[in-house]
UniProtKB/Swiss-Prot annotation:
Biased composition (Basic and acidic residues): 722-731
Main location: nucleus
Record function comment: Histone demethylase that specifically demethylates both mono- and dimethylated 'Lys-9' of histone H3. May act as a transcription regulator controlling hair biology (via targeting of collagens), neural activity, and cell cycle.
Residues bound to Fe cation: 1000, 1002, 1118
Top-rank taxon: Eukaryota
Stated name of the protein: Lysine-specific demethylase hairless
Reactions listed under catalytic activity: N(6),N(6)-dimethyl-L-lysyl(9)-[histone H3] + 2 2-oxoglutarate + 2 O2 = L-lysyl(9)-[histone H3] + 2 formaldehyde + 2 succinate + 2 CO2
Pro residues biased stretches: 307-321
UniProt organism field: Mus musculus
Gene Ontology molecular-function annotations: DNA binding; histone H3K9me/H3K9me2 demethylase activity; transcription corepressor activity; zinc ion binding
Residue intervals of the JmjC domain: 939-1150
GO BP term, example: negative regulation of DNA-templated transcription
């Protein structure tokens, strides 16, 4: 036989040089008989290697195994030590567990039969080489040692999974040198990547692993395989006797685990299904942590699961006597101590009497007989694996409280969340064994050092910082389940009994990680609602605000809140310049947020009287000179308790006050922009997230940007052309008074030519073929290159076109621009004739499951919506003429020119002529009777039935999450938003110039439900058919339904043109189109035709049948005509899409009733509360 195996012949000379003493692996100063430690090895025990082979005092490989030339141990030729014995002298010159650089000089050869009958190394004395210089030669066909070879270069690798015969209960005892394979041998073969070593040479203890030197995740992995799994072999018998792996989690099938890879490696077809293998071999992953490479990589260390050796999770110091399981490493002060039973030797002895405590602490890897260890395996798994999130067994290392803190901190990181709760990484074509453990519950801890000083641990804990308060809130809800579900008759260990009543940090983390997806979702919703409630908002709308609705709220209201915050900073800066100190904070629910002089809403900063409820907004405070007279007079006796509004208030009596502190607003602004970036919500605000502008500086002064130099948005060339367009059409904030529009207007967002070029370059990049840059080149263009010309021509054309439109539309364009900004609608150019409007939305279900986003899109564009199917939930007995005839109401007369006028008729006379036209009272030819009633407390049953029948309850219901009325203060009266009952007589076909509701503009959104309509008489069918044929294809109705009312709805941006048209065609005083005021004119077919042909304004026509609802956005002019006698119920709501437009209309409505004015003055407050609720819901969302 050859003196050297063939796979070692090409070894360099320096690798084959024998040590000085002549015996490979012999340690100086030791006798040949002490070359091997006589000790047993527990399952899961790590054994380090030096120069590719085992070389520590704990080495238990067979005699003659290949050793390195440095710090090696002696090997005995011919006869090895007896099993079960150990030598205390081994520990004399050692310093505890030491890792050396390990590097395979040669790849192992794997060939030959799958399961050889006998195993054993070829002893040098049986070979032809020199026994002292020729190392052990393996039989190439019978290699039992399966090593981890897919490792980092010059990094430690792990012990071969081969055990002595006495550890294999299923195998008969053989010669001392016959070492059968362990039940789960693994092979990793591959080249060594060129990366720095993880451990230094000759270092004491462990070094911190640098995550920067981990192997890249995309590095190709080596082929893996298993040996000795042929039918009838020892390994196959052991696998069959082993049964299902203890590492397998409950509910996990073998399909998701590793298959038999032995035939793949050896060339045998895998025809017989094999039993599932454990995810990691015993003793491989022990003290190096659970991640070798970063999450998501397919490297070896990451795919290895937790080690098989269970650990004792209970706290307490370790027991001093030695001889404990090698799986328990030396514990620092405060670490989790090992189980008592693991420390006692079955022989009743521990370490020798001559060993010191220091030596016992260093000799942490001493092995105890595995019989006792294997007996406790299932017991420990039953007790602790589920409690401490150890699927299939706990790690062999002891874990300190600092490690628990690290685990809690890592659990909140995005990487860990993505790896632990997301789908498992895709397996490669030939995955390594152990990948089956990857999943939703796979441990994703980073490598941590075990041996270290207490000072280092404290320093690391200080660097980590305190934990989040939300984690403590979650931990308080968890229940301790330690040692509650164990086998009958099994006694708990002493340390577990001591910790039975405590709920540790690690236990809470494990409980939280083990929650089902439904429980996690419920817990997240509870935490989100708790966070929102702590923010101070109302409990109703914030309790169940989901992620989709919160994003919609924030996308529609975030820009407006930024404008409000910008005005707030300007107000504070002006107050500081006037010498005012920090504003006082006061917020009482019963105080109306309304200016006592201009009746505009108060967002935050304002002036108030210290003796009464008199308040002034910032604009009125400037006019009144608030805060100035106090310095001049120097006395405050001039204002007394007599400070009623009739007597007026002295300027010195006003105090600068805030409802919300500036610090709270700054935090909300910062968090809102962070949520925008997190969920990719597109905002178009001017503000730059800088909390320093809110913080008061030295001497009470605040750093505030001047009003003349607002921050400008950074240009981009990502194809977003609407961003620049929306910024250019920015108008003063909705809360500004009309008198301040001219003075408070900000300059254009493009003060320089460079910014103008940047803002238009995006459009030009998309429009021209030869332009692919955001800015024009500085160098002159070639004669054949017209890029500069195209850019300049486009800029000039856009400016000129805009100026032409402004001149053509007159002074009302700026108000119309505000309307366009509120609805994000393009301005319709003036043409002789326009094409019909776009298709309208008709919802067949009141609460659509799949059409909600479609409704939001149409609603954002300012289009009306028709909804059918409401009659299914309406109780006809509550809305019929017989039930409503007993109710009272106000009867009004409506004419074609003028608002409704009250009459002397009572409601009884009105209801008698409702169904019988011959009994109706005598009226003028150009008038129609109406009846109006507010549904209040006496109509509780009807209000309840209406609330349950409302379509799109997120918008229309009072407590809808997208209805800003639900965010208003609780003490505010909502009379304008209460349901209103309207009944009207039908209009004859020959009187088409009359309507049941004249052309008007509502300040808020409107929904009108037709609850009842009288049956049509036979002559009316022909008139209805003629009427439908004259719609010119601009209407929407449901075929086959009983058409009862006709709606004409115009665009909101066309209101200014319609107003000018009415001033031309209507008598003086009848052509006003004031927001919130009753209509004074009805446009018949002739006037609508003139408006369409001469002014380019067209309308949508909707035909409404009983049981249908029409939704009209705020600011959209509309009128209604009843073909028959009808009863309808209308209700107003405040949607986020039209909130900015509603605020502008509120300022323009001079004749609004006081209760309406008080309601709309709180719009800014509702926006603030809605944004705060949305930010709170999205801040912790995933």
């Amino acid at each position: 036989m050859e003196s050297m195996p063939s796979f070692l012949k090409d070894t360099p000379a320096w690798e084959k040089t024998a040590p000085v003493n002549g015996i490979v692996g012999q340690e100086p100063g030791t006798s040949p008989q002490d070359g091997l430690r006589h000790g047993a090895l527990c399952l899961g025990e790590p054994a380090p290697f030096w120069r590719g082979v085992l070389s520590t005092p704990d080495s238990w490989l067979p005699p003659g195994f290949l050793q390195g030339p440095k710090d090696t141990l002696s090997l005995v030729e011919g006869e090895g030590p007896r099993n079960g014995e150990r030598k205390g002298s081994w520990l004399g010159g050692k310093e505890g567990l030491r890792w050396k650089e390990a590097m395979l000089a040669h790849p192992l050869a794997f060939c030959g039969p799958a399961c050889p009958p006998r195993y054993g190394p070829l002893i040098p004395e049986h070979s032809g080489g020199h026994p002292k210089s020729d190392p052990v030669a393996f039989r190439p066909l019978h290699c039992p040692f399966l090593l981890e070879t897919k490792i980092l270069e010059r990094a430690p690798f792990w012990v071969p999974t081969c055990l002595p015969p006495y550890l294999m209960s299923s195998l008969p005892p053989e010669r001392p040198y016959d070492w059968p394979l362990a039940p789960n041998p693994w092979v990793y073969s591959g080249s060594q990547p060129k990366v720095p070593s993880a451990f230094g040479l000759g270092s004491k203890g462990f070094y911190h692993k640098d995550p920067n030197i981990l192997r890249p995740a995309k590095e190709p992995l080596a082929e893996s395989g298993m040996l000795g799994l042929a039918p009838g072999g020892h390994l196959q018998q052991a696998c069959e006797s082993e049964g299902p792996s203890l590492h397998q989690r409950d509910g996990e099938t073998g399909a998701g685990r590793q298959q038999n890879l032995c035939p793949v490696f050896l060339g045998y077809p895998d025809t017989v299904p094999r039993a599932p293998w454990p995810s990691c071999p015993p003793g491989l992953v022990h003290s190096l942590g659970n991640i070798w490479a970063g999450p998501g990589s397919n490297s070896l260390g990451y795919q290895l699961g937790p080690p098989a050796t269970p650990r004792c999770p209970s706290p307490g110091p370790p027991t001093p006597p030695g001889g404990c399981c090698s799986s328990h490493l030396p514990a620092r002060e405060g670490d989790l101590g090992p189980c008592r039973k693991c420390q006692d030797s079955p022989e009743g002895g521990s370490s020798g009497p001559g060993e010191s405590s220091e030596e016992r602490n260093k000799a942490d890897s001493r092995a105890c007989p595995p019989s006792h260890h294997t007996k406790l395996k299932k017991t420990w798994l039953t007790r602790h694996s589920e409690q401490f999130e150890c699927p299939g067994g706990c790690s062999g290392k002891e874990e300190s409280p600092a490690t628990g803190l690290r685990a809690l901190k890592r659990a909140g990181s995005p990487e860990v969340q993505g790896a632990s709760r997301g789908p498992a990484p895709k397996r490669p074509s030939h995955p390594f064994p152990g990948t089956g453990r990857q999943g939703a519950r796979a441990w994703q801890e980073t490598p941590e050092t075990i041996i270290g000083s207490k000072a280092e641990a404290e320093q690391q804990e200080e660097q980590r910082g305190p934990r989040d308060g939300r984690i403590r809130l979650q931990e308080s809800r968890l229940v301790d389940t330690s040692c509650q579900h164990h086998l009958a008759g099994v006694t708990q260990c002493q340390s577990c009994v001591q910790a039975a009543g405590e709920v540790g940090v690690l236990t809470g983390h494990s409980q939280k990680s083990r929650r089902s997806p439904l429980e996690e979702k419920q817990l997240e919703e509870e935490d989100s609602s708790a966070t929102s409630e702590e923010g101070g908002g109302g409990p109703g709308p914030e309790a169940s605000l989901n992620k989709g609705l919160a994003k919609h709220l924030l996308s529609g209201l975030g820009d407006r809140l930024c404008r409000l915050l910008r005005k707030e900073r300007e107000a504070l800066a002006w107050a500081q310049r006037e010498g005012q100190g920090p504003a006082m904070t006061e917020d009482s629910p019963g105080i109306p947020h309304c200016c006592s002089r201009c009746h505009h809403g108060l967002f935050n900063t304002h002036w108030r009287c210290s003796h009464c409820s008199h308040r002034l907004c910032v604009a009125c405070g400037r006019i009144a000179g608030a805060g100035k007279n106090r310095e001049k007079t120097g006395s405050q006796e001039q204002h007394t308790d007599d400070c009623a509004q009739e007597a007026g208030h002295a300027a010195c009596s006003l105090i600068l006050t805030q409802f919300v502190s500036s610090q709270a607003l700054a935090e909300l602004s910062t968090v809102m922009h962070q949520v925008w970036a997190k969920f990719d919500i597109r905002g178009h605000c001017f503000c730059q997230v800088d909390a320093r502008v809110w913080a008061p500086g030295d001497g009470g002064q605040q750093k505030e940007p001047t009003e003349k130099t607002p921050p400008t948005p950074q240009p981009s060339c990502n194809g977003d052309s609407n961003r620049t367009k929306d910024i250019k059409e920015e108008t003063p904030d909705s809360t500004e008074s009309p008198a301040e529009d001219g003075a408070g207007r900000s300059p254009l967002p493009c003060p320089s030519l460079c910014e103008l070029l940047a803002s238009t370059a995006v459009k030009l990049c998309l429009g021209h073929d030869r332009i692919h840059m955001a800015f024009a080149p500085v160098t002159p263009a070639l004669p054949s290159d017209d890029r500069i010309t195209n850019i300049l021509d486009s800029i000039i054309a856009q400016v000129v076109e805009r100026k032409i439109q402004e001149k053509a539309l007159g002074p009302g364009l700026r108000a119309g621009s505000g309307l366009r900004k509120g609805l994000s609608l393009p301005l319709s150019p003036v043409r002789t004739r326009l094409s019909p409007p776009g298709a309208l939305l008709w919802l067949q279900e009141p609460r659509p499951k799949h059409g909600f986003h479609l409704f939001q899109e149409h609603w954002r564009q300012g289009q009306p919506v028709l909804v059918s199917g409401i009659q299914k939930t309406l109780r006809l007995s509550l809305w019929g003429m017989e039930a409503l005839g007993t109710l009272g109401g106000q009867v009004q007369t409506l004419t074609a020119l003028g608002p409704p006028q009250p009459t002397n008729l009572d409601s009884t006379a009105f209801w008698e002529g409702f169904s019988h036209p011959e009994t109706r009272p005598k009226l003028d030819e150009g008038s129609v009777l109406l009846l109006h009633r507010t549904l209040g407390d006496k109509d509780a049953s009807r209000v309840q039935n209406l609330a349950s029948s409302l379509p799109l309850p997120e918008y229309c219901a009072h407590q809808g999450k997208l209805n800003l009325a639900s965010y208003l203060p609780l003490g505010l009266t909502l009379h304008p938003l209460e349901p209103q009952l309207w009944a009207a007589y039908g209009v004859n076909s020959h009187r088409g110039h009359l309507g049941t509701k004249n052309l008007c503009v509502e300040v808020s959104d409107l929904i009108s439900i037709l609850v009842h309509a009288e049956a049509q008489l036979p002559p009316w069918y022909r008139a209805q058919k003629d009427f439908l044929s004259g719609l010119d294809g601009e209407g929407l109705w449901s075929p086959g339904s009983q058409t009862s009312t006709v709606w004409h709805v115009f665009r909101a941006q066309d209101a200014q043109r319609i107003r000018r048209f009415l001033q031309m065609v209507c008598p003086a005083g009848a052509g006003t189109l004031e927001p919130g005021a009753p209509g004074s004119c009805y446009l018949d077919a002739g006037l609508r035709r003139r408006l369409r042909e001469e002014w380019g304004v067209s309308c949508w026509t909707l035909l409404q049948a009983p049981g249908e609802a029409v939704l009209v956005p705020a600011g959209a002019p509309h009128q209604v005509q009843g073909l028959v006698s009808t009863i309808s119920v209308t209700q107003h709501f405040l949607s986020p899409e039209t909130s900015a437009l509603s605020a502008q209309l509120y300022h323009q409505g001079a004749s609004l009733p006081p209760d309406h004015r008080m309601l709309y003055a709180q719009m800014d407050r509702a926006v603030f509360q809605a944004v705060k609720a949305a930010v709170g819901a999205l801040q912790e969302a995933k």
